[in-house]
């Protein structure tokens, strides 16, 4: 396994002339039995990287749809050990890169070294910790790197150029640009300031840049071409599954 796996998968999509697709689903959603079926369908039907949420009781950075889904998973008893055990069982059938996203507390309780070791053994390629400041995460990033796991840097509109440059020194996998998309007349549009921020990120980072901003419809991908290398979507997928449709159907529309 390589620490560059996530970047490699996104760059493969770029070589095909398209954006990398990164669907997000909270671990154990919509239920224990169906979750891995959804993950395998996402992989089979074109996901380049699959992002699995680590449920947490206080998901301060999540929107209402993701938060509600994550809290349901917690109520169902989903935890990190369950996610890693299931991933170990299914990883050989998944060609996409695999990324875990969540908060620091569950990882800290698991034990940092033990987590890194178990996550690597399960086939995790990258990790996003939404509430871990860069300065506090340097040692953890180095620990993860020992196990070929990339700690993904998070940036956004409020990230100054000098801080982006700092993040870029230790960044592996890809840069995750967090944004809230404005809506006008029911059609989501990308504000000019976001476009400028993305241009800055592309200039600073020598790894791919992915945008997570609440994609609602496939037509929005067109607007991102040339601005980012990959797009993350979570709420749209959760709503799709909630409506009784499959992940395979979702990917066919977005691919």
UniProtKB/Swiss-Prot annotation:
Which InterPro entries does the entry link to? Aldolase_TIM (IPR013785), RibuloseP-bd_barrel (IPR011060), Trp_synthase_alpha_AS (IPR018204), Trp_synthase_suA (IPR002028)
**Reaction catalyzed:** (1S,2R)-1-C-(indol-3-yl)glycerol 3-phosphate + L-serine = D-glyceraldehyde 3-phosphate + L-tryptophan + H2O
Q: Which Pfam families match?
A: Trp_syntA
Record's GO cellular component, any one?
Answer: cytosol
Question: Which residues does the entry assign to the active site, renumbered to this chain?
Answer: 51, 62
GO MF term (any one): tryptophan synthase activity
Which pathway does the record list? Amino-acid biosynthesis; L-tryptophan biosynthesis; L-tryptophan from chorismate: step 5/5
Q: Does the keyword GTP-binding apply?
A: no
Name the Enzyme Commission number(s) assigned to this protein: 4.2.1.20
Is Oxidoreductase among the key words of this record? no
Keyword annotations for this protein, in alphabetical order, are: Amino-acid biosynthesis, Aromatic amino acid biosynthesis, Lyase, Tryptophan biosynthesis
- Please give the HAMAP family that the UniProt record associates with this protein: Trp_synth_alpha
Q: Which family does it belong to?
A: Belongs to the TrpA family.
User: Quaternary structure?
Assistant: Tetramer of two alpha and two beta chains.
Q: What does this protein do?
A: The alpha subunit is responsible for the aldol cleavage of indoleglycerol phosphate to indole and glyceraldehyde 3-phosphate.
Please state what the protein is called.
Tryptophan synthase alpha chain
Q: Source gene?
A: trpA
């Amino acid at each position: 396994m390589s620490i560059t796996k996530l970047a490699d998968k996104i760059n493969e999509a770029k070589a095909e002339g398209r954006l990398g697709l990164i669907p997000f689903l909270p671990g154990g959603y919509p239920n224990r039995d169906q979750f891995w079926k959804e993950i395998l369908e996402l992989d089979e039907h074109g996901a380049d990287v699959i992002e699995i949420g680590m449920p947490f009781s206080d998901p301060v950075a999540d929107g209402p749809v993701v938060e509600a889904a994550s809290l349901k998973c917690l109520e169902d008893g989903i935890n990190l050990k369950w996610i890693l055990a299931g991933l170990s069982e299914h990883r050989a059938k998944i060609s996409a890169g695999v990324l875990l996203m969540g908060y620091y507390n569950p990882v800290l309780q698991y034990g940092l070294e033990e987590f890194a070791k178990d996550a690597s053994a399960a086939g995790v390629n990258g990790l996003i910790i939404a509430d871990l400041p860069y300065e506090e995460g340097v040692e953890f990033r180095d620990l993860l790197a020992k196990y070929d796991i990339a700690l993904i840097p998070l940036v956004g509109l409020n990230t100054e150029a000098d801080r982006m440059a700092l993040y870029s020194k230790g960044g592996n996998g890809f840069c995750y640009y967090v944004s809230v998309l404005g809506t006008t007349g029911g059609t989501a549009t990308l504000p000019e300031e976001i476009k400028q921020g993305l241009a800055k990120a592309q200039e600073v980072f020598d790894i791919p840049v992915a945008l997570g901003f609440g994609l609602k419809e496939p037509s929005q991908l067109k607007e991102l071409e040339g601005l980012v290398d990959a797009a993350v979507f979570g709420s749209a997928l959760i709503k799709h599954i909630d409506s009784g449709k499959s992940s395979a159907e979702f990917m066919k529309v977005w691919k």
